[in-house]
Amino acid sequence: MVEKTERIWMDGELVPWDEAKVHVLTHSLHYGLGVFEGIRCYALQQGGSAIFRLEEHIERLFQSAHIATLPMPYTQAQIAEACLETVRVNGLDSCYLR
């Protein structure tokens, strides 16, 4: 079950949960073509959190997009920063990122 957060990273910016929508004619909805990664973020005993193997997950995401001939509109560094910022802005310490 998905837990509602304050903000979701979408199209390069953090938007309120209720505003994160895709159009009904979105290509991936019509044709089922897309790539994604599931990434765990864990709470640390000393406080804060760590995203498990973030760089490796992002590299695999880009490899998958390349194989599927899907253009990536962001750099790997931008995706990594988006993951970190999403966790921080939502005050999460343990979560699952997609």
Residue ranges and their predicted role:
Residues 1-98:
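Conserved alpha/beta cores of soluble small-molecule-handling proteins
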